[in-house]
Amino acid sequence: MSGNIGANPVIIIGCASAYAVEFNKDLIEAEDRENVNLSQFETDGQLPVGKYSLSTLINNKRTPIHLDLQWVLIDNQTAVCVTPEQLTLLGFTDEFIEKTQQNLIDGCYPIEKEKQITTYLDKGKMQLSISAPQAWLKYKDANWTPPELWNHGIAGAFLDYNLYASHYAPHQGDNSQNISSYGQAGVNLGAWRLRTDYQYDQSFNNGKSQATNLDFPRIYLFRPIPAMNAKLTIGQYDTESSIFDSFHFSGISLKSDENMLPPDLRGYAPQITGVAQTNAKVTVSQNNRIIYQENVPPGPFAITNLFNTLQGQLDVKVEEEDGRVTQWQVASNSIPYLTRKGQIRYTTAMGKPTSVGGDSLQQPFFWTGEFSWGWLNNVSLYGGSVLTNRDYQSLAAGVGFNLNSLGSLSFDVTRSDAQLHNQDKETGYSYRANYSKRFESTGSQLTFAGYRFSDKNFVTMNEYINDTNHYTNYQNEKESYIVTFNQYLESLRLNTYVSLARNTYWDASSNVNYSLSLSRDFDIGPLKNVSTSLTFSRINWEEDNQDQLYLNISIPWGTSRTLSYGMQRNQDNEISHTASWYDSSDRNNSWSVSASGDNDEFKDMKASLRASYQHNTENGRLYLSGTSQRDSYYSLNASWNGSFTATRHGAAFHDYSGSADSRFMIDADGTEDIPLNNKRAVTNRYGIGVIPSVSSYITTSLSVDTRNLPENVDIENSVITTTLTEGAIGYAKLDTRKGYQIIGVIRLADGSHPPLGISVKDETSHKELGLVADGGFVYLNGIQDDNKLALRWGDKSCFIQPPNSSNLTTGTAILPCISQN
């Protein structure tokens, strides 16, 4: 009968229904049908009386917690029994929980007493699925997790860092070098998070240090307050406002956090586009604090992953490798400020304005606050104020409309009362309108984000701060607007993008920035998905216009290689050409080579030759690039970004984690090279791995890549579900089974075999290592040298001392099971 040994137990288990059954042992092809113990398989959904740790699903949605659930005896059957606290964690309404109070059994409620609730227990996964009417559950959005299930993580510390180095050597003149770094360090304790931003820059001339700057733009403490759907921040921070300009301050703030709510309007972040003329470094900053930095190759670039919490003016700087610098500003005004009916969103802060780095300024104490109230289904009222104990006050009021098929629209008016240095107190007004509309039928998006007109006497808080500290280089804004339009024409496979931003000033010349981009994919014979793009842009900064026209054609060469040609014309009508080859056939190693120059440079063999290489590891990302132009210059650039996280359970270097993101530490109990989340992270020699950039307030499943485990390693809990709060360091310990496998036959002292279906467990850890099949056959995994294995059935038990790995032979091992009764 040995040929059926491996299949029969599976068939038996699969026949179990949701009710108690008694197996017909005559159907079992076993040598001794009476010597069979299938009690643990006879009732699906039942467990012996006791308490068990289970993962849970509610209406097919996995919850991010394990519950210690009780099984109690009711009508000669066991049933799951849930405490009121556990019902709250599972998301049941207060009304339902109150109704169960009259029928508690030893402090818990057998939920299957409710005819509309069904449960299913997967014993193999130790997972309980609960199906309940949606009306009995508080939360109806499948993409959001309620506060009761949020995880604040564990105590720990981290460092997220970005390192840059460059060397520029002209054919004539001095060499220059630069070393820079920016990032964030943090410490977590419970729900509290301590954070400090840092930025370091050192320049050299012929190897001699010229200037060194080290700043800590922000040092602050924050924590989520779930009961208020808000975040509390204490320290050096920036005001967060959809009405007023942002400024740096030291003090305390409280802000409602949209991410704690079910999905709704969750803010807006701008897309920054531009054209780099060489290998360039793009820096986005606000209030002199670096927000984003990236190396980009020559040609158009787009930055689309800025945080949606950014408000106000953003400064963009493009530093070309030959020393040229281009600067402009981008507004990050929010789309119309709408709130669902009956809800209030708010932010408030108080303290004293400071410069970046915390330098003391001669500034007044201030308080600022704003709100948005959902008055009607499609109408929101909003407003705010900035109040000081000196000569500046500002008030704002506005209304936002959801016009349904016509889009979204808002209007607001802001009044300022300010007395600037050596001037009389003046009252000024600023008027603003926002509009956004997506045309579903055509797939186009129109955003008129922020027409604003300010009279000459209107003063912002930033302007008042600058004037009080005798900074005279600020501009008195008169009018500004931003328009963006995006349209995809499916029939032509053509995408269009247009953006226009205009600013005028009372005391300075105006500037207009605009960009037009057309892109299309098409096929040429055997060449599929050939991509072309045409981009025209104008950047106006301090009365200097920079016009650029860029044409690019990219031809895919297979699935991971690209041949490209680009043509660029600048404001002086100079035309340059670039030919490049990009190869990403290795997911962790990509490289490119290119040649660029104008017609004369190619003719004289003086085109610029560039090469770049990027290497992705579990511990960070390395980027190298170099450029050389004969008789002109050469340059070298290098960057590395990564993170380091430490807790009481261990520490690990890992891939870069954004400062606003959470992270998750996996403890594999000392087992190295466990791949996590599709090899996004791997455990180190101490068994510790960190998965970076885990979303906050969203149920996230983190997994072990079980197909690529090291030899002789098994993982029981290969999927971990969690919902982390902002900035949390999550933690889970894997049930790692490390050891060798044994295929054998268990024999008792009298030559018989243990009953079919008995578990074989490690005597020390009590982990199940296998099940007894027909004729005592067993497959065991996770065996360690000198393990002692135990089998128990009824009032009987026996123990196995398996052979050590060094004594294993091929074939089936005989495993004597010795009774110690």
UniProtKB/Swiss-Prot annotation:
Cellular compartments per GO CC: cell outer membrane
Molecular functions per Gene Ontology: fimbrial usher porin activity
SUPFAM superfamilies per record: FimD N-terminal domain-like
Top-rank taxon, per record: Bacteria
Alphabetic keyword roster: Cell outer membrane, Disulfide bond, Fimbrium biogenesis, Membrane, Signal, Transmembrane, Transmembrane beta strand, Transport
Membrane topology: Multi-pass membrane protein
Gene Ontology biological process terms from the UniProt entry: pilus assembly
UniProt xrefs under InterPro entries: Fimb_usher, Fimbrial_membr_usher_CS, FimD_plug_dom, PapC-like_C, PapC-like_C_sf, PapC_N, PapC_N_sf
Disulphide bonds in the chain: 798-817
Main function: May be involved in H(2) production during fermentative growth. Involved in the export and assembly of a fimbrial subunit across the outer membrane.
Family according to the record: Belongs to the fimbrial export usher family.
UniProt name for this protein: Putative outer membrane usher protein YqiG
UniProt lineage: Bacteria, Pseudomonadati, Pseudomonadota, Gammaproteobacteria, Enterobacterales
